[in-house]
Amino acid sequence: MPFSKAWRSAVYPDFREQGAYINYKATKDILHRMKEDIANPSTPDELYNSLLLQKCRVYKWCEKKIKELLTVAEALMAASDYLTEEDTKTNLSLVLNTLGSGNMKCLPPNEARLLADSITHELLRFVECCNLNTDTIEHIIGRMYRYAVLGPTGKHWNNIMTEYDYHKLSIHEIFYLLSKVYDRVTATENMRIVKRSGIPAGTVGSQVFDRRSVKYWVHLQDLPFVIARIIPHLPHSTFKETYQTCKERNIPFTLGSPVSSVYWDNNEFLLYHRRLERLEGATLIRMRWYGDPLENDWNKLGPNDSVFMEIKVHHEAWSGERSNKRRFALKEKEVNSYVHGELDLNPALEKLRAKKASKKELHNFMDLSTEIVTKIDAYDLKPVIRTQCSRAAFQRGIDQSIRVSIDTDLRVCAEDFGLGHHWRYSGVDAPVSYFPYAVVEIKLQCAENERIAPWIEELMSCRYMESVPKFSKYAHGIASLYGHTPFIKMVPYWMHQLDIDIRASTKPEQNQWDPTVGLASGCWERTTDRAIFGVGHAQTQTVGASEAQFLPRTDYTRVYQKALHGIRGEGVATPATADNFQDAEAEGGCASGTAGSRKQQLQPRLPAHTLQYDVDRRHKAYTTFHLYPFAEYGVESLCFTPASGKNAAAEVLSGLIPWQTGKRIRVPQKYDPKTLLTSERYMLKWTEHATRLGLVGLGVIQFGNSMTLPGDVTQLSSFWRANFHIVLGIALVLVALMTLMYALMTFKARSRRVYARKKIRFDDSWGPTVLTVFLAFGICVIAMMHILGRYGPMLTGDDNF
């Protein structure tokens, strides 16, 4: 079975020895007995009990592993107080052994980063272990539909995924501590750079900035891998530090904070349709507030809490204006009066004047407040939906150049359309729709023609994130809750693709685009292309991909094990036996000196399996065996071959474009008219030449005369003398038809490539080559015939040559 082989390749041997996996082999034996005795009702119960017992064991192991990771992360966080800016050479083994002893006096930034990377590596291995267990259970349940009469029936089977749910165990606290450590390390390294160069980091002159935002879907299984790529570069950002409060109150800590928004529209959903059609001036109005992370009730809002009145206006590129978002804050008790046009804004103006706001700021405030309430009255807007999510933001201080936000637990609930004469619905029985994925938004602010950071390029192109441009929580909520009503004329393009599996483990490897290769697949074509385009760095590699290094290949597992032994005191408390001294000498330590120095220099005993394992071991196993372990329609797990499956190669000549490599959500694109017009002109050029050639062929057929043929042709048979002009004309017409077909097929292929927005060459790599070869061959043949006809008898001495 492909899954059985992939499972054996995907497990981590050290975790397997600790009992961290569902025993697929033992479970498969029960499935085989179920297949042999399909009518036995006790076999499904035996399988359920076996799975539940194994999940209980795995759950306990996960709890223990999380506590272990948290202990190491807390020790590193405490040691980061002693980060030094000096280039001090230290013994890494000594640092690891004293990590949890409280004797840390000096910690270089590079070693602190190495320790943080090793903890991150171990944490991602733990996540992969949990994900493989989930895939195993899904695969087993999928096979039960074949082997059992009625499949997994009974109420207890409905709870098999929720019983001992190890995915509910939070790892947010570990990520928070690692984020703080990375932030301190980066700050220390920047201070070291400032001391060396004397130029403050980030000092730039006046620049013109380009702002853009890209949204992605991330499966919850893959979310830790995305966070692990962010925290080494951007720290966790929050308005209110809740970590210590959660520790004191014994409350589970989460990275996110509640964000709630109430969107306003009319009964015909005018703003929704205009927004979905991307019309010039499309407007969106909402009221947003930020909840307390320590509160379980996200709807809780006090009378004096701030509520932001926001308006977003879309502008097309041809308008010369940029889409913008503007907002101002009011107290919750003032919102009802404001939306009904009864609120006196003079006190708010006086507060702004007291804060020494400029006249322009006062003018903008009055314009914005008047614009929102005017649109509410003009379009008869009412509260229609409410979106709520837990948002985790990653940003370095007040630097707006790079900001990443992650929205989880996204839910959309219906409002009462103003029937309660309140700006939001205060009941508890509203219909709710839950979004299955996390939403990652990357906001960039960079100067014109400035290259973005390599790690951002790597993050945006990694297989863990699925790009969904123009994704809108408001549009999704309207389509989810009211899409069945006659008032909704259209829905977003992603609504029918929510059931597509976007897990990274089901995606093939993404090969980096090489612009020197293009459509060429052979060695000769590659050599020719590189001779033309060159072999420079910018031509041969994707820009930024070669520099974006995440967790370079280091023995992180061994570093983590050493740190863990040092925290537990096992490295110091190891008995000073002869074997230990030999181990210390093998590690490069010294067995001489005082007893205290010996204890510090001794290496802790490590298991024999401290080998380096990739964090994407499961994905590599699935890719090797072409296995995609997810069940469609709840029936069977599917396998796709790379030749004929969903990721088959493009048939460029016929113009068929398959799924983009590593991409599952199909996105409609706007096409540049100039590109299509250029392609049409290219086709018309070929059509023009084909038409001329075809007319010449038709003229030869109609008006040709064999009497005007050369003398060597008149010596042929009577048939050829009478029909030679017809044969010649037909040949010309066939060449013209082939040229027309080539022009049409090339135009279609290029158009589809433009539609798909694939990173491949748009020029024709075969047509000019074939045409040049045929012309060169024809010229050579004609030249050789003339040379042989004129100089052949002289060179050979034969008059009959």
Swiss-Prot record:
Null mutant phenotype: Results in growth defects in procyclic forms (PCF) and changes in acidocalcisome morphology and number. The mean number of acidocalcisomes drops by approximately 2-fold, but individual acidocalcisomes are considerably larger and less circular. Also affects cellular polyP and PPi content. Short chain polyP drops almost 2-fold, while PPi nearly doubles.
Residues of the active site: K473
Gene3D superfamilies associated with the record: VTC, catalytic tunnel domain (3.20.100.30)
Domain of life: Eukaryota
Entry's Gene Ontology cellular component terms: acidocalcisome membrane
Residues that, per the record, bind Mn(2+): E441
Keywords: ATP-binding, Manganese, Membrane, Metal-binding, Nucleotide-binding, Transferase, Transmembrane, Transmembrane helix
Ranges of the Cytoplasmic topological domain: 1-692, 745-768
Cellular localisation: Acidocalcisome membrane
BP terms from Gene Ontology: polyphosphate biosynthetic process
Catalytic activity, EC: 2.7.4.1
Residues at which ATP binds: K215, R286, R288, K312, K325, R391
Regulation (activators, inhibitors): Activity of the enzyme is Mn(2+)-dependent and enhanced in the presence of pyrophosphate (PPi).
Membrane topology: Multi-pass membrane protein
Presence of keyword Manganese: yes
Cofactor(s) of this protein: Mn(2+)
Function field: Component of a polyphosphate synthase complex that utilizes ATP to synthesize and translocate polyphosphate to acidocalcisomes in epimastigotes, insect-stages of Trypanosoma brucei. Catalytic subunit of the vacuolar transporter chaperone (VTC) complex. The VTC complex acts as a vacuolar polyphosphate polymerase that catalyzes the synthesis of inorganic polyphosphate (polyP) via transfer of phosphate from ATP to a growing polyP chain, releasing ADP.
Subunit structure: The VTC core complex is an integral membrane heterooligomer composed of at least the catalytic subunit vtc4 and the accessory subunits vtc1 and vtc2. vtc1 is a small membrane protein without hydrophilic domain. Vtc2 and vtc4 are related and have 2 hydrophilic domains that face the cytosol, an N-terminal SPX domain and the central core domain. The central core in vtc4 is the catalytic domain.
Domain text: The SPX domain has very high affinity for inositol polyphosphates. SPX domains may integrate inositol pyrophosphates (PP-InsP)-dependent signaling to adapt cytosolic phosphate concentrations to different metabolic situations.
Protein's recorded name: Vacuolar transporter chaperone complex subunit 4
